[in-house]
Amino acid sequence: EYISFLADTKSLAFKDYDALHQWSVDNQAAFWESITQFFKVDFDTPYEEVYVPATPFWKTKWFTGAQLSYAHHVFRNATPAQPAIIYQNETSEVVEISWQQLIAKTHALQQQLKTLGVVKGDVVLCYGINSPETVAAFLATNALGAVWSSCSPDFGTDAVCERFAQLSPKVLFAHQQYAYGGKVYDISTKIKTISDSIGAIQNTLLLDDHLSFDDAPVAINQIHIEPVSFSDPIWVLFSSGTTGKPKAIVHGTGHMVLEHLKALALHQDVRKGERYFWYST
């Protein structure tokens, strides 16, 4: 479909996938602009220039002037025809979370964040498991234009603080318990240690209080969507810390919108209605 799109709109022809890949490498600006067009990326503010090269390379700018929202591109696919999330942990049955339930939970968590004064550019953390309520917490954070970062609950407090303390976070989401290998672990003491050790954290919200999902009649447009600049951070990851303190790895919002659309469709051939699983911490 993408190759046909390039033929129809750009008069480009490729004999095979390798030729397409080589074109994308040799013509980066044209390639990434075509991704925005093929996937109909919604820019709240249009871009001025696609690509502004610079030396050193990390000062290169993409889609200058553009504003957009990652959360918007998630919720624009909402449909009652299929679930948003299918979830199971070691101690639960399989549950399906509808798009309406995800919208309602995201809205509820976003209202809490707004009450706590979280605004665009603030950092919100999560020390918890991969779960539907964690997804909703991320979407609530992202929709406000705030920055997300997270650590797995099996991390020790020192490892977490080494990472999170670099970010001057305002709010910490956390799960008090998690199950692994047939055992349930209580980390409430670790949560308090982290919160007390990082002075910037003003409030801790326990995701254990948000395990239930309902079909509250919340419309998508009731979730506040705050567009951010293309290169504004969406989340902060960290290196392993094996050669010194963990180093922050910042991903841009627009970069992740484009990369996820491109990677899931062109590399992994994920199509509408299919189910996708990514094994990760």
Predicted regions mapped to residue ranges:
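Conserved AMP-binding/adenylate-forming core of the ANL superfamily
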Residues: 18-23, 71, 85-139, 156-161, ...
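Structural core segment of the AMP-binding/adenylate-forming
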Residues: 143-215
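N-lobe entry segment of adenylate-forming
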Residues: 1-97, 101-104, 108-114, 195-200, ...
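Conserved pre-ATP/AMP-binding loop-to-beta segment of ANL
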Residues: 81-83, 206, 218-238, 245, ...
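Conserved AMP-binding loop of ANL adenylate-forming enzymes
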Residues: 122, 126, 268-281
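Generic beta-strand/beta-sheet core signal
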Residues: 127, 151, 175, 207, ...
